[in-house]
A protein has these predicted regions:
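Short pre-active-site segment immediately N-terminal to redox-active cysteine/selenocysteine motifs
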Residues: 30-33, 37-41, 84
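Conserved redox-active cysteine motifs that mediate thiol-disulfide chemistry
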Residues: 37-51
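Structural signal for short hydrophobic segments within the conserved structured cores
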Residues: 4, 64-66, 98-101
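A short beta-strand-turn-helix
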Residues: 6-33
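Structural microenvironment flanking redox-active thiols in thiol-disulfide oxidoreductases
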Residues: 68-78
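Non-catalytic, surface beta->alpha helical segment in thiol-disulfide oxidoreductase systems
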Residues: 84, 89-119
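Hydrophobic beta-strand anchors of alpha/beta hydrolase catalytic cores
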Residues: 34-35, 65, 88
Length: 119
């Protein structure tokens, strides 16, 4: 599976309805997810893009992997307080999402997947 470019509308449908957001996180997905917040002009984002694609392929059917262009989806970036990119949001089936800020290599990301998504 390739990564899917996510819009605000898709986020509301597949992850969480922003209008109904409260103190409690209510994930709509049917499997854990990773959201890569990036920008097309960001060097570190370009560096991890192939790694994120590899994760999407390696974990196909187990984890949904999305990409959010922060310049096109400012509302989503603001909602999660994204100020540094790349930022990866790891969304488990239960519990709150966990963020990873900055470019990380595959072993580090796989550890986060095991620790937070595929327990």
């Amino acid at each position: 599976m390739k990564t899917t470019e996510m819009t605000t509308a898709m986020f509301k449908d597949r992850v969480m309805d922003l209008e109904k957001m409260s103190d409690k996180w209510e994930f709509k997905g049917d499997k854990p997810a990773i959201i890569d917040f990036y920008a097309t002009w960001c060097g570190p984002c370009k560096m991890i893009a192939p790694i994120v694609e590899e994760i999407a392929n390696d974990y196909d059917g187990k984890i949904d992997v999305y990409k959010v262009d922060v310049d096109k989806n400012e509302e989503l970036a603001a909602m999660f307080g994204i100020q540094t990119i790349p930022t990866l949001l790891f969304i488990p089936m239960e519990g709150k999402p966990v963020t990873s800020v900055g470019a990380k290599m595959m072993p580090e990301l796989e550890e986060m997947i095991k620790q937070h998504l595929l327990k």
